[in-house]
Design a protein with these regions (language model features):
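Flexible glycine/proline-enriched surface loops and loop-helix/loop-strand junctions
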Residues: 66-69, 122-128, 135, 185-193, ...
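An N-terminal boundary/leader segment
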Residues: 1-29, 38, 270-273, 279-282, ...
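Glycine-rich, small-residue loops and helix-cap segments
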Residues: 48, 54, 89, 148, ...
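Structural helix-boundary/capping segments
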Residues: 89, 93, 144-258, 272-281, ...
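Short helix-loop capping/hinge segments that flank enzyme active sites or metal/cofactor-binding pockets
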Residues: 47-67, 242-259, 306-377, 432-442
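Acyltransferase
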Residues: 31, 81, 263-289, 311-337, ...
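Sec/Tat-exported extracytoplasmic proteins
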Residues: 3-13, 23, 30-37, 41, ...
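Gly/Ser-rich catalytic/binding loops embedded in alpha/beta enzyme cores
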Residues: 1-157, 175, 199, 385-387, ...
Length: 485
């Protein structure tokens, strides 16, 4: 059924192009899992369920792990990512890999979300001339289009939340360390995490629980190395469905961060309607003030540049001589040598800036990282949550999908506010769930909170979802239907 839908909806000139590679072993694996089930062996709720994963997540099978880059074409990882091992143990069927913004959108300044030199352009299923956002573009578009049951995305800043909200699905960006980062092509270790994407909060909760676990290769999952890394030991669950409460808004104290509402009156109206639902469901709303995110905008980029050079060099070196590139420097040179195929629309300024950075012992790096955590955590989310005794903070997840523009990149985006950076920079959890539509284009509402508060956020997001039930499936229109307000 899913393979038929993929052939009909994803492939071809007018397809959404969300999948970069299908698992050639999918059918025999499915047969083996069905046989297990017929014999009474059911591993859990994901047994036999088709899951798509982003193409920057390692699998040691017949599928390559490329981050959408031509430089890694054909690269077969030496072993499964830890989260993939966990999914296979849970009985999930890894159906294939999804397209993404190349290198998880950390290559050039004027990039186009959802485009990679290896996978081409992923489109939004609600309007094919609109962006699917990124960098987890394919993971979101595939789930929205029912090409799989659930998918896995990754985020450094916004790469789960933006595509989830733009494609009208639920997405969870977990606390740093809840899910192992080992076996994921990195952007920056202080912010990188994988997370679930699904059509419902319940499905996202199931997938989240299947991916948690202590990984010896990722200290953040096992012990408290420092304030930066945290620890998931005793704070992770393997079953998040226990927190699905349709009355979860009752008695909740929710902070309203209007600094993140932007200026789009249509978006604001949708969120205000959502706030009324929360109030009528028994939640108490409190107006809160967060420090402007632009205070740590430059320092965030500084940290990402330093870490990108170090982390990517480490990952590429681990692949050995089987790949064409063994370092960030090699990638930059490969891209220049293959400019017509790799750099036709935008450059690699981010990579070049990262290459110029020194090591992680730099005082400049340490100061930027400390500033990030002070503003996003101590003076940001932690301070507001503590002062008002909150269960979560809410804001819009973004605006309506903008028109795809390969000439100018994402510069034409309509959303004028950054609602993802607080939780991303802090390493704290963030959930988006559909809240409404503008001319048929999805708008999501965000819930975020302090470290390890996934249970509470799932409770609130699920209750909101059940009270509103606004999600409608995409119609794969060539362009947005302007007759629909």
């Amino acid at each position: 059924l899913y393979l038929e839908r993929i052939a009909r909806i994803d492939e071809g000139e007018n397809g959404i192009n969300s999948i970069i590679e299908l698992n050639p072993e999918a059918l025999p694996i499915a047969e083996r899992l069905d046989t297990e089930r017929s014999k009474g062996k059911v591993r859990g709720p994901l047994h036999g369920i088709p899951v798509l994963i982003k193409a920057n997540i390692d699998t040691s099978d017949y599928m390559s792990t490329t981050a959408g880059s031509l430089a890694l074409e054909g690269s077969i990882a030496p072993q499964d990512a830890f989260l993939v091992k966990r999914l296979r143990e849970a009985g999930a069927l890894i159906l294939g890999k999804t397209n993404l913004s190349e290198w998880a959108n950390f290559r050039g300044k004027n990039s186009t979300s959802g485009w990679s030199s290896l996978g081409g352009l992923t489109r939004n299923p609600y309007a094919l001339d609109r962006t699917a956002c990124g960098s987890s573009s394919g993971s979101a578009a595939a789930v929205a289009s029912n090409l799989c049951a659930v998918s896995v995305g990754t985020e450094t800043d916004g790469s789960i939340i933006c595509p989830a909200q733009t494609n009208g699905i639920a997405g969870i960006k977990p606390t740093l360390g809840l899910i192992s980062r080992s076996g994921i092509i990195p952007v920056a270790h202080s912010q990188d995490t994988a997370g679930p994407m699904a059509r419902t909060v319940a499905d996202a909760a199931i997938l989240l629980g299947a991916m948690t676990g202590v990984d010896e290769a990722d200290a953040a999952t096992g012990r408290a190395l420092s304030e930066v890394e945290g620890s998931s030991k005793g704070l992770a669950y393997q079953d998040y469905t226990q927190f699905l409460d349709p009355e979860g808004l009752q008695g909740a104290r929710i902070g309203v961060a209007r600094i993140l509402f932007g200026t789009d009156k249509r978006v604001i109206k949708i969120i205000e309607d959502g706030l009324e639902v929360m109030k009528s469901s028994g939640a108490e709303l409190i107006e809160v003030k967060l420090p402007p995110s632009d205070k740590f905008g430059k320092s965030e980029l500084e940290v990402l540049l330093y870490e990108n050079k170090s982390d990517l060099n480490g990952y590429l070196a681990s692949l050995g001589q089987k790949v064409k590139v063994q370092s960030l420097k090699d990638v930059i040179e490969f891209n220049e040598e293959n400019r017509k195929r790799v750099l036709p629309y935008f450059g690699q300024e981010r990579m070049e800036a990262a290459q110029r950075k020194r090591g992680l012992t730099s005082k400049r790096y340490a100061n930027a990282l400390a500033k990030n955590h002070r503003l996003s955590r101590l003076e940001g989310i932690d301070a507001v949550m503590l002062e008002h005794e909150l269960d979560a903070i809410v804001c819009p997840s973004g605006g309506p999908a903008w028109m795809i523009d390969l000439v100018n990149g994402d510069g034409g985006r309509s959303w004028d506010m950054d609602s993802t950076s607080y939780a991303a920079v802090a390493g704290y959890p963030h959930i988006t769930v559909p809240a409404g539509y503008i001319f048929g284009l999805p708008i999501g509402i965000s819930f975020f909170a302090g470290a390890w508060q996934e249970p509470q956020l799932i409770r609130l997001a699920y209750a909101f979802e059940q009270k509103t039930r606004v999600r409608v499936p995409p119609r794969f229109l060539k362009t947005a239907d302007l007759r629909v307000p």
